[in-house]
Structure formats: structure tokens, C-alpha cells
Amino acid sequence: MLISRWYDPANLMRAGSPIRSFLWVIFLSALIHVPAEAARPFVTDDARLTTAGSCQLESWTRFYADSTEVWALPACNPTGHLEFTLGGGQARYQDASLSASEDYVLQAKTLFRPLDTNGWGWGAAVGTVRHPQINPGPNLHGNTYIYFPLSVSFADDRVVMHLNTGWLHDKSLSRERLTWGIGSEINATHRLTLVAESFGDDLASAYWQTGVRYAIIPHLFQVDATVGRQTGASDAYRWFSFGVRFTPASLF
């Protein structure tokens, strides 16, 4: 989770705070999003891991009214039981007075029950997000988090539902937050998948996102596009995203 610091919602919704609102969405994406078969363009994670003995790369660009972010999240599963993700993103703003900001993500994920066709699975992930531009120096403030993804398969995998619940410790604000996400993927054809989800925490209004994923080379290379926004928020909280995902069968 996701792809993707969490700020006080009152500050996030305050006009003239583009960096805070933007980075809140970035972190939420990083928190909920770690690659798997559901993966891009989902923020809500699933109960799957990257292919055993291999790595994958997800990269995407997200466009807001006054900023653009670019992300790259490589993930590897060398043993088949533990997946590691190490990546980051950069945000650039239309306002020339605002410098670009960067985030870095480190996460580990495992499964307690793998997801089977017409069955269910669940697991756990733990990680941290760092914000060097906001918290400079050798002792960077960041966020430590844990979440539990649950996935359920229906109709021979034509429909798969995902549910996430988690906890976040905001080091910079010394605050705890409960996180959540719910999403669905509908496999319209063997190449085309429709996705929809909602996600957020216990202190702010929810976000939603919907879009499509298309496998140019099934099980190897896909592209996707989404539109999303925060419920009840202004157009500044609306985004469009385009992404790619590369999933080779074996690297080790």
C-alpha cells in the first residue's frame, strides 16, 4: 500500500497548502500499494506476491491541477515467501517558487495464506516512507506502517475483491492513524481489466479511483490509466494517472 507522511486533515484541506496535500496523496499511494497481480493501478494491495525468484517494475505518472508526480517501485521475491520493495517518487509543481520534493519507500511483505481461484488469501506488510526534502539531516523523520491485505476470488478469478486494514505511526507529528482500502478488479477479457477502489484513513474523507488495465503482453507487460479524487474536495484533489508494469517470469 501504495504506491505511496500523513498530515492533519485540517491543514490538508486548507487553501494554499499544495505540498502538504500532494504529499499526503503520494504517501497514501505508497502505503497501500505494493506490486502483485492486482498491483497497478491499484492503491489497495492484494494477497499475492511478486513471482518467486523474480523481480518486477512498476512506474507511473500522476497529474494534478498544479503538480505532477513520477514513481518507480521495483519489487523482488528471491525466496518465494518474502517480497521486498525499494523505490521512490518525485513531485514537481507549476508554482516556480516551490522546489521538487522526493519520497523513498522501503517495504517487506509476506503471505499467511496464498490467494487461490474461487478462494481467499491474506498476508501482512511492514514498511517506512522517508521525506528528505521535508526532514533534512541524517536522522530523517518518516512513517512506519503495517497493514493486512485480504483478497477473495469469485467466478474463476473473473472478479477479485481486495480489503486492506492497517496502522500508521506519523513520526513528525507523533500521531497514530488507522488506514483502510477496498477495491475490485473485473477481468473483462484475458487482456482487459476494469478496476475501482476507495481508500483513506480514520481522520480524513475517502479517496476513490477507477480505471482500466490492459496487458499488451499477458503476464509480462501491461499499461493502465485511472482517474480519481478525494470525496467532497476541490478539483485540486483530482488526478489522472498513466502507468506501466513489467513482470518477467524469472531473474534469479
Residue spans for each PLM region:
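Transmembrane beta-barrel domains of Gram-negative outer membranes and organellar outer membranes
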Residues: 37-252
